[in-house]
Design a protein with these regions (language model features):
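Conserved acidic segment of CheY-like receiver
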Residues: 3-13, 18-22, 51
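Short hydrophobic/Thr-rich beta-strand motif most characteristic of the beta2 strand and flanking loop
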Residues: 27-34, 42
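Acidic catalytic/metal-coordinating carboxylates
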Residues: 35-38, 61-64
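Receiver (REC) domain active-site loop signature in two-component systems and cognate sites
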Residues: 57
């Protein structure tokens, strides 16, 4: 798998877990963003094959990250990875333009399924 993934999460521990999970499923390159503002600044259309973002981050929230990225690239897959599992939150993310939703904690196999579902596997 040669996908390039942008990983946005304010927890350095969570970013490491996500990146290890990506490596375990064959994603060789992940770029880290420690908050929503950094994620938006790093994103450029065509630079990433997928974006993984947390919901609650300083600066821009995951929803704001999704909206900003969607305004630049309506087709890049964006997966929200969060502890927010309530239906209303999932609906908010869908309305913002998220491609998929993954609740923490997750397994590498579940992440692989999401990547494959969105053409990054």
């Amino acid at each position: 798998m040669s996908a390039r993934v942008l990983v946005a999460d304010d927890s350095s521990t969570m970013r490491k877990i996500i990146i290890r999970s990506l490596q375990a499923v064959g994603v060789p390159e992940a770029v880290e963003a420690s908050d929503g503002n950094e994620a938006v600044n790093l994103f450029q259309p065509g630079k990433f094959d997928m974006v993984l973002t947390d919901w609650n981050m300083p600066g821009k929230s995951g929803l704001e990250v999704i909206q900003s990225i969607r305004s630049q690239d309506p087709n890049v897959p964006i997966i929200m990875i969060t502890t927010e599992a309530e239906k209303s939150r999932v609906l908010q993310a869908i309305q913002a333009g998220v491609s998929d939703y993954l609740v923490k904690p997750f397994t590498a196999d579940t992440l692989r399924e999401k990547l494959e579902k969105h053409g990054c596997g």
